[in-house]
A protein has these predicted regions:
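Transmembrane beta-barrel domains of Gram-negative outer membranes and organellar outer membranes
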Residues: 22-165, 169-256
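Cleavable N-terminal export/targeting peptides
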Residues: 1-32
Length: 256
């Protein structure tokens, strides 16, 4: 079975498993919120314009499943095609699994969710060939998802990434603190949402080097359970990110 077959088979399995748990309102927009209690699965394609004239095509499936009204399990699997090593290479790149415990809170009188959890990141590719990350890591996280009104979501989040197994080809271990600021606005007149996601990183193995990437996402639900979105990532030309110049992508989202 090829990679697209694997991804679509995985999506079908998740769609067929119908949970009895209630989902939050505006679930199409809330699925882009890491602190929201929703069940969904995305199938996504992204193109990355890398440094030195190289590029990368990434085929991904990402989603979340509520094991309990307060316990969320997320998944992400990536397959890439890249010429960053000088020739075309294809492989599975990385698997991510994340468990998040959600607690309803109301600081300053604002409806919110406290999110505490941890993420496991498993390298599946080859770092030398550009198809792998070169490290297996764990990443505890803490964040608050703010809901000031029915149309806006604001998420403040921080993770610490620590590699416990590193490829010999990689110069440094992973020791990174990653603050994140997300704004999501529901667009009921369009049946969709807009998301701005600023992802920052402080590399403690590289003289506390600060890096950042901005993701802009616009999506629309075409039915209560199916939607789609497009996204743009801005890299070093705008925000001094060294990983890539820019990235564009699109996805199908299934709520279940």
């Amino acid at each position: 079975m090829n990679v697209l077959g694997i991804i679509f088979s995985s999506l079908a399995i998740f769609v067929l498993i119908r949970p009895a748990l209630a989902q939050e309102k505006n679930s199409g927009a809330a699925a882009s919120d890491p602190t929201a209690a929703v069940n969904y699965q995305d199938v996504r394609y992204r193109y990355f314009d890398l440094d030195r004239g190289a590029d990368k095509h990434s085929f991904q499936t990402e989603g979340a499943y509520m094991l309990h009204p307060r316990l969320k399990l997320t998944n992400e699997l990536r397959y890439v095609n890249t010429d960053s090593s000088g020739k075309s290479e294809q492989d599975f790149e990385e698997l991510k699994l994340k468990g998040i415990h959600l607690t309803n809170i109301k600081p300053f009188g604002i409806k919110a969710k406290l999110a505490l959890g941890a993420e496991w990141l498993k390298d599946l590719g080859d770092f030398d060939k550009g198809t792998g990350t070169g490290a297996d890591s764990i990443a505890p996280l803490a964040g608050i998802g703010w809901v000031p009104d029915d149309r806006n979501f604001i998420i403040t989040l921080v993770q610490y990434f620590y590699s416990y197994d590193t490829d010999n080809a990689r110069d440094e271990d992973v020791r990174e603190t990653a603050p994140r600021l997300i704004w999501i606005r529901s667009l009921p007149e369009l049946g969709g949402w807009f998301k701005a996601d600023l992802k920052m990183s402080i590399d403690h193995e590289d003289d506390e080097n600060f890096d950042q990437v901005l993701e802009l996402q616009l999506g629309k639900m075409v039915s209560p359970s199916v939607g789609f979105y497009g996204e743009v990532f801005l890299g070093d030309d705008v925000l001094d990110s060294n990983a890539y110049n820019y990235s564009v992508g699109g996805a199908v989202r299934v709520m279940y």
